[in-house]
Each structure stands twice: as C-alpha cells, then as structure tokens.
C-alpha cells in the first residue's frame, strides 16, 4: 500500500475546514438526544429518508417514545460517561460550539454514533439484560471497555497520533483474543486493520511513493491458500453466498421460462468459488423441466483467474452433458472496468441475463465514473434481467472513522452468527474469521485508493446508482420461498429474510447482511 495514498488521505481528513466538518457531523444526527439515566425514556429508530444525499450515507434518525429502558442500558451510561462528558445537555448542536478543532469533531461524531448504536441495541428484543448474572455483567463491562479502546484507537489513527494509537493497540492486542467472545474475535480483526493503517501513515507532505497496484477484480484474485480454504468454509457454513445463489437462480429460471437458447454472463464467476455451485443448481433445474426443452445454454465467465475458471468450465460441461444439457462455456479475461460490449458475443435468438454475486461493489471508486461506465456497458447489452447480490452495509463513507464504526457493527453481527453456529474452539470458525472475514475487514480499515476494494453500500445507494445507469428495479416476491429455503437447508436460528423496497434481504437478528436485487433495462 502506498504511503503517499495515506499521506493524501489523512491530509484531507486533518485539513478539513472545521466549520464545514461541524456542519457535516451535525447533519448526521440532527435530532440525536443526550443519553439520560432515566428509567422511563429511550429512543427508537426511524427508517432512512429517501432524500438523504450521497455524501451523508444511511445514518439513523431517531424519535422519542415512552418505554422502559433495560438495566444494562443505564449501566452503559455510567460505564461510558467518558464518551459523553463533553456534550452540553442543553444544546445538542455541534455548530453551537465555537472554533472546534478536528479532534473535537471526531469526538463529537464518536459520541453521537455511540448514542445511536446503544439505543438500537437497547431496542432489540433478542437480548434480556435484566436477567444477566454477575459473571455476565462482568463480560458486558469487558466488552464495553474493548469498544471504547477500539474507537479511541481509531480516533488516534484518524488524527495521525501514532504514539497514542500504539499504546492503545498494545492494550487491545492483549484483550482482543482469537478464541475469545464473538466481540473479542471481531476486535482482533479490526486491531490488525488499525495496525496496518498505522504503519502506513506518513507525514502530510510526503508524496514520494507511488502505489504498486495489481490488476484485480476482487480480493480473492490475490488470495492465499489459507484464504481460499477459508472462503470454501464460508460458503459451506454461512448462508450468505448460498442465499444469493438461490434467489438469483430463481429469478434467472423465471426469465428463461419457455425459452430454448439461454445465455448467462457471470461477473466474477462467484469470486472463483470451486465447482461452479450456482450453475450446477441452474443446470439441474433446467434439466428437471418437462415443459420445455433447452436447446443450448451458454455461460460467459468474466474474470482474471483463467486457470481457476477453466477448471470450473470443464466440470460444468461434464455435469451438463450427463443431464442432457448442451452447454457452451467461454471466458473473457478482463476486469469489469475494461470490459466492452464487443467482448461478449450475444446471439439474437438468445435470452440474456447478467449475474453478479458480491462483485459490483469492487468497481465502486471515490468517483462515480468507473461503476457507472460498467453499468451502462451492461445496459447496452440489453439483458432481460440483471440480478445482483451485495453486502447490505455502508462501508464506503467519505470519512475513515464513520466507515470504521459501520463495519464494526456489520462484522460484529457476522461473528455473532458464527458464535451461534460453531463451537468456541472450532478450527473451521477460526479459519473463516482470521483468513477470510479478517481480510475483508483489513481491506476496509487499512486500505485507500484503488487497493480498497471492499466498498460495500446500502440498498438505497445501489438503487440510486442503478437508476442513473438506466435500470429499473424489478421487485422480488419470494419471501415465503426464501424462508422455506432457510428451513430446508437447516440454516441457524437467528437468520431472517425480509423484503425491503423490492429487494430480498438476509439478516442476522434483523441486522441486514446480504441483499439481492433484480433490475431490468
């Protein structure tokens, strides 16, 4: 990773105009109250406004209601007093504080974020902290301390305070255990990311080094053997990718109904996942159809790992032949930014669909241009449908600290789900966490510029991007089938499926994890 990139990044963060920064942070939570030690009031979440701008992404708006606060929430206020002692209880506006410096804005952002996160957790019915035993109270306190250390360290890193960040990292490393609680484990991954980011911080004026970038479509293109093994385990044990495959195939089968010549363009070939699981399922479903015979199925794989994709193609060809399906498999060795319509051979008789599983977010850059060009190129192919699955979280915000805390919330939910699925000392879980999810986290936390590929965004943001490229959303009406799929595949209790504005969203205890959407030209 280029030190120059970090010099530029941190210069932008530190040199922001304070008054503008104050306006930005105040706009994040315009109605956010002070946490009170009250037993009769709390705060509940409202849906996101459709009128939020792109720069200010997916932040929570709050409104007041009269309910009972759990005991642990009152304890949170006392344990976290240090995070809120700088807030004036008579005035919540950041702009009213005169001449704030950058660190003051960081601190205010942190305070407001913790307030919203605390009340969101307080509103969840899944946790009954009123019945916590003494030892559980102790673990809650330890977890709270770990959260405080993580955010304080992220603040120090954002402010280029290397000495303070190093002290905090030393304490974090002794408390964030790979085989500890779910939050200790996810904290260990964020500690790795913060450590890497800290080592890349250079003086603001140092622009001597350039970035040594390698052409990649996603982080799996440069995966180690350990990461590839971990990715297979993620596919087998977590429902995230399988859910995307199931919903996508259901949409594709509907688009292929009554057609004889079929063509699928797969962007990224499911990150190079071995054996082509998604297309085996599609081929089997097409072979099982008795109403209409498929005369030809074409699959065009877009990717850079040619050897890996060729193996998948050979296996799929044999599989399809055994089921009586004529399959033509081809590869386009390009990344999505360089892909042109002429690279994909489309026959007039064919029904074309485009499939993207956890791929398009890798094309999102600081500017809109790269992704918009890719989407317009796809639109020019006139596919019957474009189906995409993406992580449903805002990890591409303009400020490091906000991005850090959004990803901390998201991956905490994933690690909590792993906690429910696998035993504490299970080596498979450790491999998934430390060799796959940790790599995603480190990419979000430590990388900038073209090396930051895990730029996950919320459904609303994708809706705006797709609309600008000329696509129209096609609602997915299969919540019942998706829930039946969860039961059929023995997916761990705690996973939820909801329809949200035409998309199908898989979540963990209502926290969105993956969203699948369908688009037409």
UniProtKB/Swiss-Prot annotation:
Query: Where do the segments described as SAW lie?
Result: 446-520
| Residue stretches making up the GRAS domain | 137-520
> Which Gene Ontology molecular function entries are recorded, alphabetically?
DNA-binding transcription factor activity; sequence-specific DNA binding
InterPro entries (alphabetical): TF_GRAS
Segments for region (Leucine repeat II (LRII)): 311-343
Q: Where is the protein localized? A: Nucleus
Motif, VHIID: chain positions: 262-266
Q: Where is this region: Leucine repeat I (LRI)?
A: 144-212
Region annotation (VHIID) maps to 231-301
* Gene disruption: observed consequences: Reduced intraradical colonization by arbuscular mycorrhiza (AM)-fungi (e.g. Glomus versiforme) upon symbiosis in roots.
Residue span of region PFYRE? 352-443
Question: What protein family does this chain belong to?
Answer: Belongs to the GRAS family.
Subunit composition?
Interacts with RAM1. Interacts with NSP2.
Q: What does this protein do?
A: Transcription factor acting as a regulator of arbuscular mycorrhiza (AM)-related genes (e.g. STR). Required for the morphogenesis of arbuscules upon symbiosis with AM fungi (e.g. Glomus versiforme). Also involved in restricting mycorrhizal colonization of the root meristem.
**The protein, known as:** GRAS family protein RAD1
Q: What species is this protein from?
A: Medicago truncatula (Barrel medic)
